[in-house]
Amino acid sequence: RIWAATFAGGINYISQGEHGETVFINHRNNLKGYPIDVCYKARFITSDNNGRLWVGTTTGAVAFDENFKKPEDIQFHHFSRVPNDTKSLSNNDVHWIIATQQKELYLATFGGGLNKLISISENGHGEFKSYSVLDGLSSDVLLSIREDHKQNLWISTENGICKFVPSGERFENYDERSISFRVRFSEAASTLTSGGDMLFGTSNGLFMFTPDSIRKSSYVPPVVFSKLMVANEDVIPGEKSILKVDLDDTQEL
């Protein structure tokens, strides 16, 4: 089955008519249950490991069973941010959704950081765990996500690339200081090559790297004292000063 997301008319299921013609099934015909009144701006469609399709929209996420017989019978579940409910989505603008090798589902939001699906109840209520700059993200504006062969997630953000290690819930950030130049990543523009390289779209071409070659620096810079001030005034070395010789040559005060 082929699905298409539109930024004005929700989603479309592309099928064939009785005479082989292409037919677009949407909220105007047989896709009656889709919440078009609130989720008409769809950004992204993907499947998870439990037979569900997920739609990222500007007003939350929509999920439904992909094993349906007739489009009109699909039951859609809409998940959105609920004020004061920390187990709901942290932000409604969902840019990207990824199902991982560990059968987990993560959602990248524009302003609410990263969300992980914890569970969906029988009545369709979703529980999520969110990660933000308070947890180590470099930015809460996330644009896309890719998973490497070690099951780490690489996230393009407004402030560079972020590596998320799900097993330890740990973030490693790589900004322009790490990359040596400023990169402005594009929305929902990334892929993983057959060789394991990551490619992310930017405002100035493609940004490509091999995940295994990206490591945090272990260099610990030395502590160097260059100036001594007392009461907001510089201390000059001298016989009547508490600093007898230059600060570089002073062992203790």
Question: Which role does the model predict for each range below?
Answer:
Residues 49, 146-149:
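A structural signal for beta-strand register positions
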Residues 5-9, 40-44, 49:
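Solenoidal tandem-repeat scaffolds enriched in leucines and small polar residues
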